[in-house]
Amino acid sequence: MSIVDVRTPDPKRFIPGATGDWEVIIGLEVHAQVLSNSKLFSGASTEFGNAPNANVSLVDAAMPGMLPVINEECVKQAVRTGLGLKAKINRRSIFDRKNYFYPDLPQGYQISQYKDPIVGEGKIIISIGPDRQGQFEDVEIGIERLHLEQDAGKSMHDQHPSMSYVDLNRSGVALMEIVSKPDLRSSDEAKAYLTKLRSILRYLGTCDGNMDEGSMRADVNVSVRRPGAAFGTRCEIKNVNSIRFVGQAIEYEARRQIGILEDGGTIDQETRLFDPNKGETRSMRSKEDAHDYRYFPDPDLLPLEFDDAFVEALKTDLPELPDDKKDRFVRDLGLSVYDASVLVSEKAIADYFEAVAEGRDGKIAANWVINDLLGALNKAGKTIEETPVSPAQLGGVIDLIKAGTISGKLAKDLFEILWNEGGDPAEIVESRGMKQVTDTGAIEKAVDEIIAANPDQVEKAKAKPSLAGWFVGQVMKATGGKANPQAVQALVKSKLGIEE
């Protein structure tokens, strides 16, 4: 298969070396565990965290005479993913045996797909930025293919001083291997691609994307070249289980290869691993080619065939995906591209925002969700699923502001109370005397006292009207933030003789 270079060299992404500029070429092979209750070819459970070898059937253990039976739900999940990636769905695909020996691969081969995968070419649009002007750059990254395959088991080397144990709980679990084209040109692009892909999978409900549990991991192919030259020799960094680590591995590996080439050496095609503790890649073995695996069609499995009606039925039931949701937020709610991008980055955040925004001003709801809620969650190290403030509670805060019951400052205090103690926003405002002061007489008295106590500041404000804001701040402080800010501002300007 020939590899086509579709990207025009971009000087913004060049890496400066001692002898000139270099360009890094990146391709990603993402292994995403299919969200399914049972494995690809057996009825064994896929539940994470069970005791070793608790989720193992006779098929998973490769007992003699046991034959694989395809899990239809895994097939549907792969097709849904292909549709979400705007990819070609192949109506006929074939399962192959990929032959190699690992202690945790009991069959002595892995059932995968080689020449005829279930999903063909697709694409993902990633956004890079914002730059100093606040602009985003959209980049199209090609998808080469998506195929279904079995996961292997896990060798455990820390259970006994002189022996290794094997846990087959993951053996036979369905994986989607999603292979990008070599279209990525920086570690930032690679991280953006993985973030976007994970978001799409979560929206579709085809993979939970939990990299810390191993349900999504990446093999990272890296090579370097002079800008515009032919592709260089690539190295593959296996099983990187964090988006941040993927970025670090690419940065290190690109520098390593550039250093070798600038010293007159050559790059060996090899498989490497990333050590996150040292922030470096290390050689594991020479890189295999396809012929080393001796692929051939699995004689125990018929070709996988389905018609247009099968695909169309799945397409009809697809949820709204991140890009479409972002466009709707910008178009219908008037959000900025940046705010909409933040809100759709995770399905749970988008769902929370939509619950808050329903029947309310979308921009105000977005401001509270992004700045106050997500800010508090980040500070506390919590996820949106762990938020102590429900959409109904946050919506209640916004309603109280709109009704003029509380000021913006008091709303911040109310949010803190909800975060720490919970409760009903309206009841808290009532019981704690947090209602905004709208009585003009009470506000006027406070304004008069501040003006009388600061004659020097009065003269300055008359000479420079913008300084009237100082008086507004002092009145708000004197009233504990309860005064209506608009009423205070109008009274201050009136008392100082400043025209609106």
Curated annotation (Swiss-Prot):
GO terms for molecular function: asparaginyl-tRNA synthase (glutamine-hydrolyzing) activity; ATP binding; glutaminyl-tRNA synthase (glutamine-hydrolyzing) activity. The keyword Lipid metabolism does not apply. It catalyses: L-glutamyl-tRNA(Gln) + L-glutamine + ATP + H2O = L-glutaminyl-tRNA(Gln) + L-glutamate + ADP + phosphate + H(+); L-aspartyl-tRNA(Asn) + L-glutamine + ATP + H2O = L-asparaginyl-tRNA(Asn) + L-glutamate + ADP + phosphate + 2 H(+). InterPro entries: Asn/Gln-tRNA_amidoTrfase_suB/E, Asn/Gln-tRNA_Trfase_suB/E_cat, Asn/Gln_amidotransferase, Asn/Gln_tRNA_amidoTrase-B-like, GatB, GatB_C_1, GatB_Yqey_C_2, Gln-tRNA_amidoTrfase_suB_CS. GO terms for biological process: glutaminyl-tRNAGln biosynthesis via transamidation; translation. Keywords: ATP-binding, Ligase, Nucleotide-binding, Protein biosynthesis. The keyword Protein biosynthesis applies. Its EC number is 6.3.5.-. Allows the formation of correctly charged Asn-tRNA(Asn) or Gln-tRNA(Gln) through the transamidation of misacylated Asp-tRNA(Asn) or Glu-tRNA(Gln) in organisms which lack either or both of asparaginyl-tRNA or glutaminyl-tRNA synthetases. The reaction takes place in the presence of glutamine and ATP through an activated phospho-Asp-tRNA(Asn) or phospho-Glu-tRNA(Gln). Heterotrimer of A, B and C subunits. This is Aspartyl/glutamyl-tRNA(Asn/Gln) amidotransferase subunit B.
